């Protein structure tokens, strides 16, 4: 197997910022003086930069470039809603009014500007989510023979793990705590390797050996599960829901569970996203036959519309992302820059203890 060692780390910028904000929330209370908030903003920038540089050093020579993506709004919020939906996509996310968000977003803006100044790719575009960018860059870079590691905690992005059939470049998902997620097609038994040694990618094996936790998945399962079972975090509703009243008079909503969906999926032999798309009526019929959903009164037409709507919200693919936004992203392909990672590594110092002030994170860089 002809493979490539060129590997770019794609940083989910919004996730990285928000995950670090969780540790500094008290420093961004909007009743604090402006000078204190400005200081907190600069500390946030340093904290994020420190996290990035630690991950650069973690991967060492296994990566040779980095880039960051961020949200610019969401085209998904403009999609026509099916009859069974009244809620807004991600409409359940309410910003904490006690937080000075202008300082938080200014930290991200400043960080991205500093990336650009120092020849590090950082892209954003109106109405395009960071998830869309992860899809675009992973597919584009794989197509030109560059591997990608998506650094995030967003489980939706696990659907992007793949190997490009033309170039053999791959995409994997990584989180510091959860470990590495790889397409199950890369899992080889000892017998497989004996029979076809060329099937193994030595460089990907090095990537896998670097982490403590390694998981192989069918990426299509990420999409199928969320389309059927929904996601309360993103305010995506389960495909089939039935209200019922308990003995105590409380109204509950039965939703399709992962266990129920896995059973139906196995019964119907659904293994790929193509199976999923071509059998949606059969899937709905089987789900409605489950005892908990016997009282479902929704029409097949409405449920099919709901199925397609959820697919548009969940699936990161050229079939789902509107062409105008694909073209908008493609205009940025020439903004892919090659970063001098050795320079970043060599100009970074980590103190052994926290008893002294932290030195500049990128010694000569404005982070």
PLM segments and residue spans:
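Accessory alpha-helical DNA-binding modules that contact the DNA backbone or grooves
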Residues: 204-325, 354-359
């Amino acid at each position: 197997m002809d493979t490539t060692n060129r590997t770019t780390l794609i940083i989910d910028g919004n996730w990285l910022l928000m995950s670090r904000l969780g540790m500094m929330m008290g420093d961004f209370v909007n009743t604090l003086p402006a000078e204190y908030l400005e200081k907190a903003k600069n500390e946030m920038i340093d904290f994020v930069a420190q996290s990035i540089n630690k991950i650069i050093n973690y991967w060492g020579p296994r990566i040779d470039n980095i880039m960051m993506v961020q949200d610019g709004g969401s085209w998904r919020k403009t999609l026509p809603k099916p009859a069974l939906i009244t809620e807004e996509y991600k409409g359940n996310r309410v910003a904490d009014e006690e937080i000075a968000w202008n300082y938080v977003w200014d930290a991200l803006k400043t960080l991205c500007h500093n990336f650009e100044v120092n020849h590090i790719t950082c892209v954003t575009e109106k109405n395009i989510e960071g998830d869309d960018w992860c899809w675009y860059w992973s597919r584009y870079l794989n197509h030109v023979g560059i591997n990608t590691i998506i650094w995030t905690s967003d489980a939706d992005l696990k659907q992007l793990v793949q190997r490009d059939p033309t170039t053999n470049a791959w995409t994997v998902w990584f989180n510091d705590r959860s470990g590495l997620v790889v397409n199950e097609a890369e899992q080889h038994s000892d017998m497989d390797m004996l029979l076809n040694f060329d099937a193994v990618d030595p460089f990907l094996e090095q990537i896998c050996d670097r982490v403590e936790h390694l998981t192989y998945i069918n990426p299509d399962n990420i999409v199928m599960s969320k389309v059927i079972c929904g996601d309360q975090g993103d305010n995506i509703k389960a495909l089939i829901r039935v209200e019922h009243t308990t003995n105590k008079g409380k109204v509950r909503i039965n939703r399709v569970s992962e266990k129920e969906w896995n059973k139906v999926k196995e019964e119907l032999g659904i293994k790929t996203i193509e199976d999923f798309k071509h059998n949606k009526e059969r899937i709905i019929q089987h789900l409605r036959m489950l005892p908990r959903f016997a009282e479902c009164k929704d029409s097949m037409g409405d449920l099919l519309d709901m199925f397609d709507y959820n697919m548009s919200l969940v699936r990161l693919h050229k079939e789902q992302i509107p062409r105008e936004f694909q073209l908008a992203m493609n205009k940025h392909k020439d903004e892919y820059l090659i970063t001098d990672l050795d320079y970043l590594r060599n100009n970074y110092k980590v103190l052994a203890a926290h008893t002294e002030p932290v030195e500049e994170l990128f010694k000569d860089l404005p982070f």
